[in-house]
Each structure stands twice: as structure tokens, then as C-alpha cells.
């Protein structure tokens, strides 16, 4: 945010609504009238005035991503399956080994779409006007849960074809939904850290009151596909907010085991539990470019799964049968741009 040279207004970057591109705006002073300076599909950051002029300098960021599929036993044999501009940028999951659900914004809204890997165009299953993200397939592929911004983040459920959409949570805000491949329930993180019993919650896909799973305040979770174990990240407020990562059994049959050293919270939130293994697949750039690596929960050394030399990985999913890997993969390009105030 910066004052104009005449002191009659402010320049700032902001979104008109959640999920929209970040644009440059002018707010006049003192009446507070708002005027849009840019109006396109790019994102702008760090708006400022060029030296000795009224021209605006900003950083324009262009993000592109599409869905790619590879066999789990040969993850470098990867093939592109969608052509959208930002496919999977805000989440993706397998409905079946032959069908992917993912975030998309070809319509200008952040929708959820589904595509069959055997061919055919993608179909929107949750569309405007809300901003949808973090799709997770539940109940043996019959249901999709996701976060929808409806005056706050709340979790919704729809049938896999986009019918029978219903809101499942109604608190201050709810994020990071996870669910087992089989079973009609989900776990999520409540944004209300003061909620009784802890903010790691469990709810039925049929609706009703959610309940606490563990008495911790958590900031990220990851659920095994069999629904028996859950990883959670929490901050130890008695120890300089040190992050701890614990593994808990959903039925309480074993005490919480804390991992030492813990994986980073990004690995925990964005990684995926490998079917049949005590390990996560996650994105790491230690090789020089973002690639998939394994993080063992039993102390085994990490293993590199892919060997890309360029590009970004924005998200990943593993099919329930363990046969396929899906990636949201693309690029981020940034350029400095100059705008005349007459624009």
C-alpha cells in the first residue's frame, strides 16, 4: 500500500473476492471511492510509484498448471492429461484409478472439475459463485468433500457427479479435510483454536455434530487411506512454539507417538500417505528442482521418486490402489511491469 504523490489516494493490491486474481486498486482520499487500475487474469504484487513519475510499477505473476499422471512403479513416465490454465493448483484427488477430481478456473471462478483418464473433456462438479478448493474423495469414490468459501471457509460434500451438494460444517471456519477411502466420515481442522476438546475434529458425511479427536491445537493433518492412523502438527506453547508432529490411532488403541525429527508442516499438509506403507510422498527441491520424495515414518532414509530438472509441483495425489500418481505441475513466471496512471 502506498500513497499517490498528490496525497489524494492510496494504491494497493487486493482481491475483489476470495480466489480472484490479485489486482491493483486505487482508493481515493478522503471519500474512499474505489477504482480498479488493472483488470485481467494475472496477479500483481508490490505496487509502487516509478521514480519522479505517476506511473505504477508492479510485479506481475503468471502461474500455469495442469494435471499429469504416472504409474507408481515408473513415476518418471509421466503424461499430461489436462490443458487448463490452473488445473489442480488448489487440490486434486483420485475418484477412481481412472478419474481425477481437481480445482480449476477456466470459467474465471475457482471450480471443482472431474476428468476421466480414458478420454473426454473435464466436467465442472462444483461451480460459481463460491471459491472451492482442497477436494478429497471419500466413501469408496461416491462422495467428494471440499472447502468452499461462503463467507468463511466451510466444508461441503457432493456426490462424485456434482449432485446433492450439502454443507457439513458450520463453525467459525474449517479447513484441511481428509477422509478414508472407505467409510462415511471425515476429519478436519477447525479454525476456532478455543473450541472445546481441541480443534482436530471428526464428522459424519451424513451431517450432524462434529466431535474432537485429540485434545491438541493442530495446524495440519494427514490421514492414512485405511483411516486407522492420523498425523497431526501442533505447536508446543510451553516450548517457544516448537512444532511437534504426532501419530495417533483413530480408535485410541495406542498412545500418541511423536516423530523426531518431525517432517515440516508443508510436507505433512501437502504430502500423501503411500498406500500400504508407513511413509509419505511429498515435494522437495533438494535435488535442485521440485521432485517427489518419500518421508519414512519409521526412520528409513528418503527416496527420490521423480527426477524433473525444471518446473514446479503444486499438488499430488495417489490412487487408492497405489497404481498411479497424479501431479499438478507447471510454472511460475514473474515480470516487472509499468502502468501509466491514465490506464
What are these regions (language model features)?
Residues 6, 20, 30-33, 52, ...:
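Cysteine-rich, disulfide-stabilized extracellular repeat modules
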Amino acid at each position: 500500500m502506498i500513497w499517490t504523490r498528490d496525497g489524494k489516494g492510496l494504491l494497493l493490491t487486493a482481491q475483489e473476492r476470495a480466489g480472484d486474481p490479485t489486482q491493483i486498486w486505487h482508493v481515493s482520499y478522503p471519500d474512499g471511492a474505489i477504482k480498479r487500475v488493472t483488470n485481467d487474469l494475472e496477479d500483481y504484487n508490490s505496487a509502487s510509484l516509478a521514480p519522479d513519475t505517476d506511473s505504477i510499477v508492479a510485479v506481475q505473476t503468471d502461474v500455469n498448471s495442469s494435471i499429469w499422471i504416472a504409474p507408481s512403479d515408473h513415476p518418471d513416465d509421466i503424461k499430461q492429461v489436462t490443458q487448463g490454465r490452473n488445473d489442480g493448483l488448489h487440490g486434486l484427488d483420485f475418484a477412481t484409478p481412472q478419474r481425477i477430481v481437481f480445482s480449476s478456473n477456466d470459467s474465471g471462478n475457482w471450480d471443482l472439475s472431474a476428468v476421466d483418464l480414458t478420454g473426454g473433456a473435464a466436467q465442472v462438479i462444483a461451480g460459481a459463485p463460491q471459491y472451492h478448493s482442497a477436494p478429497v474423495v471419500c466413501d469408496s469414490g461416491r462422495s467428494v468433500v471440499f472447502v468452499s468459501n461462503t463467507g468463511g471457509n466451510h466444508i461441503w460434500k457432493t456426490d462424485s457427479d456434482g449432485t446433492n451438494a450439502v454443507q457439513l460444517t458450520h463453525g467459525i471456519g474449517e479447513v484441511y479435510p481428509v477422509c478414508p477411502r472407505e467409510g462415511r466420515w471425515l476429519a478436519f481442522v477447525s479454525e476456532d483454536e478455543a473450541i472445546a476438546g481441541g480443534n482436530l475434529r471428526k464428522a459424519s458425511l451424513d451431517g450432524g455434530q462434529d466431535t474432537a479427536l485429540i485434545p491438541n491445537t493442530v495446524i495440519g493433518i494427514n490421514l492414512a487411506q485405511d483411516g486407522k492412523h492420523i498425523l497431526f502438527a501442533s505447536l508446543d506453547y510451553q516450548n517457544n512454539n516448537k512444532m511437534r508432529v504426532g501419530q495417533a490411532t483413530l480408535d485410541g488403541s495406542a498412545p500418541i507417538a511423536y516423530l523426531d525429527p518431525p517432517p515440516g508442516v508443508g510436507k505433512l499438509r501437502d504430502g500423501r500417505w503411500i498406500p500400504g506403507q508407513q511413509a509419505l510422498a511429498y515435494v522437495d527441491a533438494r535435488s535442485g528442482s521440485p521432485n517427489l520424495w518419500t518421508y519414512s515414518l519409521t526412520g528409513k532414509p528418503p527416496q527420490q521418486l521423480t527426477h524433473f530438472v525444471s518446473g514446479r509441483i503444486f499438488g499430488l495425489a495417489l490412487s487408492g490402489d497405489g497404481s498411479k500418481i497424479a501431479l499438478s505441475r507447471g510454472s511460475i513466471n514473474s515480470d516487472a511491469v509499468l502502468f501509466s496512471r491514465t490506464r
